[in-house]
Curated annotation (Swiss-Prot):
<feature type="domain" description="Ubiquitin-like 3">
    <location>
        <begin position="153"/>
        <end position="228"/>
    </location>
</feature>
<dbReference type="GO" id="GO:0003729">
    <property type="term" value="F:mRNA binding"/>
</dbReference>
<dbReference type="InterPro" id="IPR019956">
    <property type="entry name" value="Ubiquitin_dom"/>
</dbReference>
<dbReference type="Pfam" id="PF00240">
    <property type="entry name" value="ubiquitin"/>
</dbReference>
<dbReference type="GO" id="GO:0005634">
    <property type="term" value="C:nucleus"/>
</dbReference>
<keyword id="KW-0677">Repeat</keyword>
<feature type="domain" description="Ubiquitin-like 1">
    <location>
        <begin position="1"/>
        <end position="76"/>
    </location>
</feature>
<dbReference type="GO" id="GO:0010224">
    <property type="term" value="P:response to UV-B"/>
</dbReference>
<feature type="cross-link" description="Glycyl lysine isopeptide (Gly-Lys) (interchain with K-? in acceptor proteins)">
    <location>
        <position position="76"/>
    </location>
</feature>
<keyword id="KW-1017">Isopeptide bond</keyword>
<protein>
    <recommendedName>
        <fullName>Polyubiquitin 3</fullName>
    </recommendedName>
</protein>
<keyword id="KW-0539">Nucleus</keyword>
<dbReference type="InterPro" id="IPR029071">
    <property type="entry name" value="Ubiquitin-like_domsf"/>
</dbReference>
<dbReference type="InterPro" id="IPR050158">
    <property type="entry name" value="Ubiquitin_ubiquitin-like"/>
</dbReference>
<dbReference type="GO" id="GO:0000325">
    <property type="term" value="C:plant-type vacuole"/>
</dbReference>
<feature type="domain" description="Ubiquitin-like 2">
    <location>
        <begin position="77"/>
        <end position="152"/>
    </location>
</feature>
<dbReference type="GO" id="GO:0005886">
    <property type="term" value="C:plasma membrane"/>
</dbReference>
Length: 306
Protein backbone atom coordinates (compact mmCIF):
# COMPACT_ATOMS: atom_id res chain seq x y z
CA UNK A 1 0.00 0.00 0.00
CA UNK A 2 1.01 3.64 -0.21
CA UNK A 3 1.58 5.92 2.76
CA UNK A 4 2.76 9.52 2.96
CA UNK A 5 5.49 11.02 5.10
CA UNK A 6 5.37 14.77 5.71
CA UNK A 7 8.48 16.66 6.84
CA UNK A 8 8.67 19.84 8.92
CA UNK A 9 9.57 21.74 5.73
CA UNK A 10 6.17 20.74 4.34
CA UNK A 11 7.57 18.27 1.76
CA UNK A 12 5.54 15.06 1.36
CA UNK A 13 7.25 11.75 0.49
CA UNK A 14 5.26 8.78 -0.88
CA UNK A 15 6.33 5.28 0.22
CA UNK A 16 5.33 1.78 -0.91
CA UNK A 17 4.92 -0.32 2.25
CA UNK A 18 3.12 -3.30 3.74
CA UNK A 19 1.19 -3.42 7.01
CA UNK A 20 3.76 -5.87 8.29
CA UNK A 21 6.68 -3.47 7.73
CA UNK A 22 8.38 -2.38 10.93
CA UNK A 23 9.12 1.25 11.71
CA UNK A 24 12.82 0.38 11.11
CA UNK A 25 11.89 -0.73 7.57
CA UNK A 26 10.03 2.52 6.95
CA UNK A 27 13.00 4.58 8.18
CA UNK A 28 15.27 2.62 5.83
CA UNK A 29 12.96 3.44 2.90
CA UNK A 30 13.07 7.13 3.88
CA UNK A 31 16.88 6.90 3.98
CA UNK A 32 16.87 5.42 0.45
CA UNK A 33 14.71 8.29 -0.83
CA UNK A 34 15.99 11.23 1.17
CA UNK A 35 19.41 10.22 2.52
CA UNK A 36 18.44 10.86 6.16
CA UNK A 37 20.04 8.30 8.51
CA UNK A 38 17.44 6.31 10.51
CA UNK A 39 18.99 7.37 13.83
CA UNK A 40 18.14 11.00 13.01
CA UNK A 41 14.52 10.18 12.13
CA UNK A 42 11.53 10.34 14.45
CA UNK A 43 8.18 9.29 13.01
CA UNK A 44 4.94 10.57 14.52
CA UNK A 45 1.42 9.29 13.83
CA UNK A 46 -1.75 10.40 15.62
CA UNK A 47 0.38 12.34 18.09
CA UNK A 48 2.48 9.30 19.07
CA UNK A 49 6.17 8.70 18.39
CA UNK A 50 6.55 5.33 16.61
CA UNK A 51 8.92 2.72 18.06
CA UNK A 52 11.39 0.99 15.76
CA UNK A 53 10.46 -2.64 16.45
CA UNK A 54 6.70 -2.19 16.03
CA UNK A 55 4.83 -2.65 12.73
CA UNK A 56 2.55 -0.29 10.82
CA UNK A 57 -0.30 -2.66 11.67
CA UNK A 58 0.46 -2.27 15.40
CA UNK A 59 -0.31 1.44 15.08
CA UNK A 60 -3.33 0.90 12.80
CA UNK A 61 -1.55 2.78 10.00
CA UNK A 62 -3.55 2.09 6.85
CA UNK A 63 -3.25 2.98 3.19
CA UNK A 64 -2.82 6.68 2.49
CA UNK A 65 -2.17 7.48 6.15
CA UNK A 66 0.21 10.39 6.71
CA UNK A 67 3.16 10.10 9.10
CA UNK A 68 5.12 13.13 10.27
CA UNK A 69 8.90 13.03 10.10
CA UNK A 70 10.83 15.06 12.66
CA UNK A 71 14.61 15.18 12.64
CA UNK A 72 16.34 14.15 15.85
CA UNK A 73 18.95 16.82 16.52
CA UNK A 74 22.23 15.38 17.68
CA UNK A 75 23.10 16.26 21.27
CA UNK A 76 19.76 17.73 22.31
CA UNK A 77 19.33 20.81 24.47
CA UNK A 78 18.22 22.03 27.89
CA UNK A 79 14.91 23.73 28.60
CA UNK A 80 13.42 24.98 31.85
CA UNK A 81 9.97 24.34 33.30
CA UNK A 82 8.69 26.79 35.92
CA UNK A 83 5.87 25.77 38.26
CA UNK A 84 3.29 28.02 39.92
CA UNK A 85 5.22 27.61 43.21
CA UNK A 86 8.20 29.25 41.52
CA UNK A 87 10.31 26.07 41.35
CA UNK A 88 12.30 25.64 38.12
CA UNK A 89 12.98 22.18 36.68
CA UNK A 90 15.72 21.60 34.07
CA UNK A 91 15.03 19.02 31.33
CA UNK A 92 17.25 17.45 28.67
CA UNK A 93 15.21 17.38 25.46
CA UNK A 94 15.44 17.42 21.69
CA UNK A 95 13.56 19.71 19.30
CA UNK A 96 11.80 16.63 17.99
CA UNK A 97 10.41 15.64 21.40
CA UNK A 98 6.63 15.78 21.53
CA UNK A 99 4.80 17.54 24.35
CA UNK A 100 3.80 14.05 25.59
CA UNK A 101 7.52 13.19 25.87
CA UNK A 102 8.18 16.36 27.85
CA UNK A 103 5.29 15.62 30.24
CA UNK A 104 6.69 12.10 30.74
CA UNK A 105 10.10 13.60 31.64
CA UNK A 106 8.39 15.93 34.13
CA UNK A 107 6.59 12.91 35.61
CA UNK A 108 9.96 11.12 35.97
CA UNK A 109 11.43 14.11 37.83
CA UNK A 110 8.44 15.35 39.84
CA UNK A 111 5.94 12.50 39.96
CA UNK A 112 3.12 14.59 38.44
CA UNK A 113 0.93 12.49 36.10
CA UNK A 114 0.85 13.85 32.52
CA UNK A 115 -2.95 14.15 32.57
CA UNK A 116 -2.66 16.69 35.39
CA UNK A 117 -0.06 18.78 33.55
CA UNK A 118 -0.70 21.78 31.30
CA UNK A 119 2.33 23.35 29.65
CA UNK A 120 2.24 26.99 28.52
CA UNK A 121 4.77 28.75 26.26
CA UNK A 122 4.45 32.28 24.87
CA UNK A 123 0.89 32.40 26.20
CA UNK A 124 -0.21 29.24 24.35
CA UNK A 125 -1.22 25.93 25.86
CA UNK A 126 0.89 23.19 24.22
CA UNK A 127 -0.87 20.22 22.60
CA UNK A 128 0.35 16.71 23.37
CA UNK A 129 1.02 15.46 19.84
CA UNK A 130 3.00 18.50 18.70
CA UNK A 131 6.79 18.83 19.00
CA UNK A 132 8.94 21.47 20.67
CA UNK A 133 10.09 22.44 17.17
CA UNK A 134 6.46 23.07 16.15
CA UNK A 135 6.25 25.76 18.82
CA UNK A 136 9.74 27.15 18.07
CA UNK A 137 10.88 26.20 21.58
CA UNK A 138 14.66 26.49 21.55
CA UNK A 139 17.49 25.82 23.98
CA UNK A 140 17.06 27.46 27.38
CA UNK A 141 13.43 28.40 26.67
CA UNK A 142 11.19 28.45 29.76
CA UNK A 143 7.83 26.66 29.78
CA UNK A 144 5.24 27.24 32.50
CA UNK A 145 3.64 24.23 34.17
CA UNK A 146 0.10 24.61 35.48
CA UNK A 147 -1.62 21.78 37.29
CA UNK A 148 -4.96 20.70 35.87
CA UNK A 149 -7.23 20.45 38.89
CA UNK A 150 -9.40 17.38 38.87
CA UNK A 151 -13.07 18.28 38.50
CA UNK A 152 -12.54 21.97 37.83
CA UNK A 153 -14.64 24.74 39.34
CA UNK A 154 -17.42 27.20 38.58
CA UNK A 155 -16.93 30.91 37.99
CA UNK A 156 -19.42 33.62 37.09
CA UNK A 157 -19.23 36.21 34.33
CA UNK A 158 -21.40 39.30 34.71
CA UNK A 159 -22.28 41.39 31.65
CA UNK A 160 -23.04 45.11 31.50
CA UNK A 161 -26.75 44.24 31.06
CA UNK A 162 -26.61 42.56 34.48
CA UNK A 163 -26.91 39.02 33.11
CA UNK A 164 -24.72 36.44 34.89
CA UNK A 165 -23.23 33.49 32.98
CA UNK A 166 -21.92 30.40 34.82
CA UNK A 167 -18.83 28.67 33.39
CA UNK A 168 -17.13 25.37 34.20
CA UNK A 169 -13.38 26.06 34.20
CA UNK A 170 -10.06 24.93 35.62
CA UNK A 171 -7.44 27.11 37.30
CA UNK A 172 -5.13 26.27 34.43
CA UNK A 173 -7.52 27.61 31.76
CA UNK A 174 -6.11 30.59 29.91
CA UNK A 175 -8.15 33.76 29.40
CA UNK A 176 -8.38 32.72 25.71
CA UNK A 177 -10.05 29.47 26.82
CA UNK A 178 -12.53 31.39 28.99
CA UNK A 179 -13.41 33.74 26.11
CA UNK A 180 -13.98 30.70 23.87
CA UNK A 181 -16.38 29.25 26.47
CA UNK A 182 -18.24 32.58 26.59
CA UNK A 183 -18.45 32.51 22.78
CA UNK A 184 -19.92 28.99 22.96
CA UNK A 185 -22.60 30.14 25.43
CA UNK A 186 -23.36 33.66 24.22
CA UNK A 187 -22.07 33.88 20.63
CA UNK A 188 -19.82 36.88 21.38
CA UNK A 189 -16.54 36.69 19.39
CA UNK A 190 -13.45 36.65 21.67
CA UNK A 191 -11.99 39.72 19.95
CA UNK A 192 -15.00 41.73 21.16
CA UNK A 193 -14.64 40.54 24.77
CA UNK A 194 -12.74 42.25 27.56
CA UNK A 195 -12.69 40.49 30.91
CA UNK A 196 -12.11 42.44 34.12
CA UNK A 197 -11.33 40.99 37.58
CA UNK A 198 -10.37 42.99 40.67
CA UNK A 199 -10.16 46.10 38.52
CA UNK A 200 -7.64 44.58 36.09
CA UNK A 201 -8.17 43.75 32.43
CA UNK A 202 -7.17 40.08 31.92
CA UNK A 203 -4.60 39.21 29.24
CA UNK A 204 -5.32 36.39 26.82
CA UNK A 205 -2.24 34.23 27.40
CA UNK A 206 -2.41 34.23 31.20
CA UNK A 207 -4.28 31.65 33.28
CA UNK A 208 -7.03 32.04 35.87
CA UNK A 209 -4.46 30.87 38.45
CA UNK A 210 -2.14 33.72 37.43
CA UNK A 211 -4.82 36.17 38.54
CA UNK A 212 -5.76 34.16 41.66
CA UNK A 213 -9.27 33.64 40.28
CA UNK A 214 -10.82 30.93 42.42
CA UNK A 215 -14.08 29.01 42.52
CA UNK A 216 -17.19 31.19 42.43
CA UNK A 217 -15.19 34.32 41.56
CA UNK A 218 -17.07 36.83 39.40
CA UNK A 219 -15.49 38.32 36.28
CA UNK A 220 -16.96 41.32 34.48
CA UNK A 221 -17.44 41.15 30.72
CA UNK A 222 -17.21 44.39 28.79
CA UNK A 223 -17.80 44.46 25.05
CA UNK A 224 -15.03 45.99 22.99
CA UNK A 225 -16.91 48.26 20.60
CA UNK A 226 -15.59 48.15 17.07
CA UNK A 227 -14.26 51.56 16.07
CA UNK A 228 -14.42 53.13 19.51
CA UNK A 229 -15.55 56.70 20.27
CA UNK A 230 -14.26 60.16 21.12
CA UNK A 231 -14.32 61.74 24.57
CA UNK A 232 -13.02 65.09 25.81
CA UNK A 233 -10.79 65.83 28.78
CA UNK A 234 -10.84 69.38 30.15
CA UNK A 235 -7.97 70.69 32.29
CA UNK A 236 -8.10 73.36 35.00
CA UNK A 237 -6.37 75.76 32.59
CA UNK A 238 -9.38 75.39 30.30
CA UNK A 239 -7.57 73.34 27.64
CA UNK A 240 -9.63 70.51 26.09
CA UNK A 241 -7.95 67.28 24.91
CA UNK A 242 -9.73 64.87 22.53
CA UNK A 243 -9.14 61.12 23.04
CA UNK A 244 -10.02 58.06 20.96
CA UNK A 245 -11.29 55.42 23.39
CA UNK A 246 -13.51 52.37 23.73
CA UNK A 247 -16.20 51.82 26.38
CA UNK A 248 -14.13 48.93 27.65
CA UNK A 249 -11.02 51.08 28.26
CA UNK A 250 -10.08 51.26 31.93
CA UNK A 251 -9.35 54.56 33.64
CA UNK A 252 -5.67 53.44 33.67
CA UNK A 253 -5.83 53.21 29.86
CA UNK A 254 -7.30 56.71 29.62
CA UNK A 255 -4.59 58.15 31.89
CA UNK A 256 -1.94 56.47 29.72
CA UNK A 257 -3.48 58.13 26.62
CA UNK A 258 -3.39 61.50 28.41
CA UNK A 259 0.26 60.88 29.27
CA UNK A 260 0.98 60.13 25.59
CA UNK A 261 -0.65 63.41 24.55
CA UNK A 262 0.32 65.74 27.38
CA UNK A 263 3.27 64.13 29.18
CA UNK A 264 1.50 64.10 32.57
CA UNK A 265 2.36 60.93 34.56
CA UNK A 266 -0.75 58.87 35.45
CA UNK A 267 0.05 59.06 39.18
CA UNK A 268 -0.36 62.86 39.01
CA UNK A 269 -3.75 62.63 37.26
CA UNK A 270 -7.20 62.65 38.85
CA UNK A 271 -10.15 62.29 36.53
CA UNK A 272 -13.60 63.54 37.51
CA UNK A 273 -16.92 62.77 35.77
CA UNK A 274 -20.38 63.73 37.01
CA UNK A 275 -18.81 64.86 40.27
CA UNK A 276 -17.13 61.50 40.93
CA UNK A 277 -13.41 60.71 41.00
CA UNK A 278 -12.79 57.79 38.63
CA UNK A 279 -10.96 54.70 39.92
CA UNK A 280 -8.11 53.22 37.88
CA UNK A 281 -9.36 49.65 37.50
CA UNK A 282 -12.89 50.59 36.41
CA UNK A 283 -13.94 51.05 32.77
CA UNK A 284 -15.58 54.00 31.03
CA UNK A 285 -18.65 51.78 30.64
CA UNK A 286 -18.78 51.30 34.43
CA UNK A 287 -19.28 55.05 34.78
CA UNK A 288 -21.67 55.27 31.82
CA UNK A 289 -19.20 57.54 30.01
CA UNK A 290 -20.40 57.68 26.42
CA UNK A 291 -19.23 59.26 23.20
CA UNK A 292 -18.47 62.98 23.46
CA UNK A 293 -18.65 62.94 27.27
CA UNK A 294 -16.33 65.43 28.98
CA UNK A 295 -14.06 64.38 31.85
CA UNK A 296 -12.26 66.89 34.08
CA UNK A 297 -8.56 66.46 34.77
CA UNK A 298 -7.21 67.68 38.10
CA UNK A 299 -3.50 67.42 38.87
CA UNK A 300 -2.54 65.56 42.03
CA UNK A 301 0.06 67.71 43.80
CA UNK A 302 3.15 65.81 44.89
CA UNK A 303 3.50 65.47 48.64
CA UNK A 304 0.07 66.80 49.54
CA UNK A 305 -2.76 64.82 51.07
CA UNK A 306 -5.10 66.05 48.32
Amino acid sequence: MQIFVKTLTGKTITLEVESSDTIDNVKAKIQDKEGIPPDQQRLIFAGKQLEDGRTLADYNIQKESTLHLVLRLRGGMQIFVKTLTGKTITLEVESSDTIDNVKAKIQDKEGIPPDQQRLIFAGKQLEDGRTLADYNIQKESTLHLVLRLRGGMQIFVKTLTGKTITLEVESSDTIDNVKAKIQDKEGIPPDQQRLIFAGKQLEDGRTLADYNIQKESTLHLVLRLRGGMQIFVKTLTGKTITLEVESSDTIDNVKAKIQDKEGIPPDQQRLIFAGKQLEDGRTLADYNIQKESTLHLVLRLRGGSF
